[in-house]
């Protein structure tokens, strides 16, 4: 049987160095090394602002439910949703960071006191029917609008016509909390022909599990989502659907294959088609450091407009790559040329254009202070 504190203890110990980082900032000039500072950023740069926090760091709005903010997903017609790994909740915000009254509970797996959501996706179709109970206890079913993966090995759906207060487990690979449970660190929604498919990154077993629109397992060709040129000990960590393909980030496993090992150069990013066929080794080593979040920047996002942005959980930096070649273009930096660092960086998505959530603003969630805290922030391109 496992518990969240046991699984994350090593990660928190590794992240204890985060006291040297601000929750969202570049290093102070007196502490910055030559490698951290780059000239030519005084007119075209990026600016970060912490919109929400659990109170552990200054922010525009407080929210005690926001601890270890992980996945980020936008309702195309509404608020952003953030998966709160540390509280087993999902919380909603507008573009200023103002919390929405709706707070959704994510069910715990056996051995957990609360759910441990990681990846989250929005689903707007009629599939992914979720079975649950109404607030009065009556059974009811309906299509999930948001779907969550958890470190406990479960996938849950939230169907608003069933129960707005909680999601319901639709895939259970927790194995009763045993040692062989899946540990889903990321989730993506993609397609195979005319169908929708869920892709869950199982870090523990070094694989990507795939489910159809009925939450049933899908068998892909042998060797799907594998890269024989990866070093041993690397496993799927984050996953993001972009332009019909799946970007999969790989992080180095600890001895228990439960958590990532941070370190400069500890990371790879591959691109696969919906059937799991390797298309491209997109990025490797270099500045990668336990990479998790992936987003494609709009053309209006400053000097890195149109680039693929990859966020490092390991050191909190955000790095840009050419969308076709994967050539490293540089790191997001502030007006002093210092790398922007988001302590405990996880999910990153551009806004939906509604509720003060611009399509050229990058919204990010994080678990600062060794994943004990939580933040939701925005990073904008600035020209002057």
List the predicted regions and their residue ranges.
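Intrinsically disordered, low-complexity segments enriched in polar/charged small residues
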Residues: 12-19, 279
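Exposed, low-complexity/repetitive linear segments and helix-based recognition motifs
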Residues: 3, 32-33
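N-terminal secretory signal peptides that target proteins for export/translocation
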Residues: 1-13
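Sequence/structural signature of beta-propeller domains
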Residues: 33-384
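Bacterial N-terminal signal peptides
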Residues: 16-29
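Intrinsically disordered, low-complexity, hydrophilic segments
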Residues: 8, 28, 36-37
């Amino acid at each position: 049987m496992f518990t969240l504190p046991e699984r994350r203890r090593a990660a928190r110990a590794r992240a204890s160095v985060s006291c040297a980082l601000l929750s969202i900032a570049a290093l102070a000039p007196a502490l910055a090394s030559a490698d951290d500072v780059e000239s030519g950023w005084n007119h075209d740069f990026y600016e970060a602002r912490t919109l929400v926090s659990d109170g552990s760091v200054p922010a525009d709005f407080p929210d005690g439910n926001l601890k270890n903010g992980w996945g980020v997903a936008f309702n195309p017609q509404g608020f952003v949703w953030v998966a709160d790994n540390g509280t087993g909740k999902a919380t909603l915000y507008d573009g200023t960071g103002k919390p929405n009254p709706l707070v959704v509970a994510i069910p715990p797996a056996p051995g957990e006191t609360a759910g441990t959501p990681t990846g989250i996706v929005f689903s707007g179709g009629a599939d992914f029917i979720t079975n649950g109970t109404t607030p009065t206890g009556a059974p009811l079913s309906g299509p999930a609008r948001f779907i969550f993966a958890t470190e406990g090995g479960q996938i849950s759906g939230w169907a608003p016509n069933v129960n707005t207060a909680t999601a319901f487990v639709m895939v259970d690979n927790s194995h009763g909390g045993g040692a062989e449970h899946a540990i889903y660190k990321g989730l993506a929604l993609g397609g195979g022909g005319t169908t929708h498919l869920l892709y869950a990154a199982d870090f523990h077993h070094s694989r990507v599990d795939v489910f159809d629109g009925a939450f049933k397992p899908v068998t892909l060709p042998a060797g799907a989502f594998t890269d024989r040129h990866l070093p041993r000990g690397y496993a799927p960590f984050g996953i993001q659907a972009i332009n019909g393909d799946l970007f999969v980030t790989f992080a180095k496993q600890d001895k228990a294959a439960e958590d990532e090992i941070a370190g400069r150069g500890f990371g790879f990013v591959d691109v696969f088609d919906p059937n799991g066929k390797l298309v491209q080794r997109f990025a490797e080593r270099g500045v990668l450091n336990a990479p998790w979040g992936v987003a494609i920047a709009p053309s209006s996002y400053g000097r890195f407009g149109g680039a693929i942005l990859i966020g490092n959980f390991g050191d909190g930096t955000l790095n840009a790559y050419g969308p076709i070649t994967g050539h490293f273009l540089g790191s997001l930096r502030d007006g002093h040329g210092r790398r922007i660092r988001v302590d405990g960086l996880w999910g990153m998505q551009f806004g939906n254009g509604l509720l003060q959530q611009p399509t050229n603003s990058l919204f990010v969630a994080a678990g600062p202070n060794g994943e004990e805290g939580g933040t939701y922030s925005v990073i904008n391109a600035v020209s002057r």
